Amino acid sequence: MSQITLPAFHMPFQSAGCHPGLAETREAAWEWAAAEGLDLSVPARRKMIRTRPELWISLIFPQATQAHLDLFCQWLFWAFLVDDEFDDGPAGRDPLMCERAIARLVDVFDGAAPNGPMERALAGLRDRTCRGRSPQWNRQFRRDTAAWLWTYYAEAVERAAGQVPSRAEFAKHRRDSVAMQPFLCLHEITAGIDLPDSARSLPAYIALRNAVTDHSGLCNDICSFEKEAALGYEHNAVRLIQRDRGSTLQEAVDEAGIQLARIAERVQRAERELIEEIEAAGIDGPTRTALERCVRDYRGLVRGDFDYHARAERYTRPDLVELDERDSLSRHFAA
């Protein structure tokens, strides 16, 4: 039974719908996992079923081709496996084990020969995704993916040292740890665009990207707080508000809801400022079209992420956390 009542969240963006190929992409994801040898333990399988990666990807990319939807869902399936290994399993409680595992994943992403199912799955996803993309896109995607992976090591070290980040430090950390930025890169694939470095360097585009990512991170923290509290996981914005202010759990959740509304306003402000910067810089042609597409689609992305957290049992059923089976989650990095 939940100990908190979620506040009435402010959500100014309309839903873009859900991809009709959701069931097909779910089937494709599980078939892909089996083909890659990603042998999930019984509790890990139950958790992945509750997580519903196919729902998130279908709400985020409702207009994608089925091939893109399947590929992106397989990325998300793999990312959730990584997340559960390092958040819930022993690999995330041993900094040395964590460092070795993350370094290997980053090396494989950079072209090293893979060993084991998780590394082979990553190499396959990388090849299918990055082939034919521009150098600037590949640089951004590599940066975002590696930065996300290394956040698990940072958290493992802080846990081992008995440290808790400040709220300001955590906000910066969460921008990478929520793993939204790589999916903003994937958005370019399904949108048929490829932003030049000049567009990626626009202050308002950076602000828009950060606001979209920050919204996802805080929404996730609010909706996963009870699950993470049961596991003793401290890297959560709601928990940090509670510690910082000495407030009750409900007061911390309410404050986080207010902050979430402010981030939605940041998204809207960044949209307006990006249009102003496009005009001021004299940007036209395909680059202008691509940036305008980002403005339009990012609204639906924020809304889709928001709707997902209200529907997936990973977040709506904290009572299903299996405390006595945490060690069985880590088969790939704790050997």
From Swiss-Prot:
Entry note: cofactor: Binds 3 Mg(2+) ions per subunit. To a lesser extent, can also use Mn(2+) instead of Mg(2+). Cannot use Fe(2+), Co(2+), Zn(2+), Ni(2+), or Cu(2+).
Membrane-spanning ranges: none
Entry GO MF terms: hydrolase activity, acting on acid carbon-carbon bonds, in ketonic substances; magnesium ion binding; manganese ion binding; sesquiterpene synthase activity
Motif NSE/DTE motif, residue numbers: 220-228
Cofactor(s) annotated in UniProt: Mg(2+); Mn(2+)
Binding of Mg(2+) 3, residues: 220, 224, 228
Sequence motif DDXXD motif, residues: 83-87
EC class name: lyase
GO BP, sorted A to Z: sesquiterpene biosynthetic process; sesquiterpenoid biosynthetic process
Record note on disruption phenotype: Cells lacking this gene do not produce (+)-caryolan-1-ol.
Protein induction: Expressed under the control of A-factor (2-isocapryloyl-3R-hydroxymethyl-gamma-butyrolactone), in an AdpA-dependent manner.
Residues that, per the record, bind Mg(2+) 1: 83, 87
One Pfam short name: Terpene_syn_C_2
Keywords: Hydrolase, Lyase, Magnesium, Manganese, Metal-binding
Catalysed reactions listed for this entry: (2E,6E)-farnesyl diphosphate = (+)-(E)-beta-caryophyllene + diphosphate; (+)-(E)-beta-caryophyllene + H2O = (+)-caryolan-1-ol
Noted pH dependence of activity: Optimum pH is 7.5 for (+)-caryolan-1-ol synthesis.
InterPro entries xrefs: Isoprenoid_synthase_dom_sf (IPR008949), Terpene_cyclase-like_2 (IPR034686)
Highest rank taxon of the organism: Bacteria
Temperature dependence: Optimum temperature is 30 degrees Celsius for (+)-caryolan-1-ol synthesis.
Pathway annotation from the record: Secondary metabolite biosynthesis; terpenoid biosynthesis
Chain's role: Sesquiterpene cyclase that first catalyzes the cyclization of farnesyl diphosphate (FPP) to the bicyclic sesquiterpene (+)-beta-caryophyllene intermediate, and then its conversion to (+)-caryolan-1-ol via a second cyclization and the addition of a water molecule.
The name this protein goes by in its record: (+)-caryolan-1-ol synthase
Natural source organism: Streptomyces griseus subsp. griseus (strain JCM 4626 / CBS 651.72 / NBRC 13350 / KCC S-0626 / ISP 5235)
This protein's encoding gene: gcoA
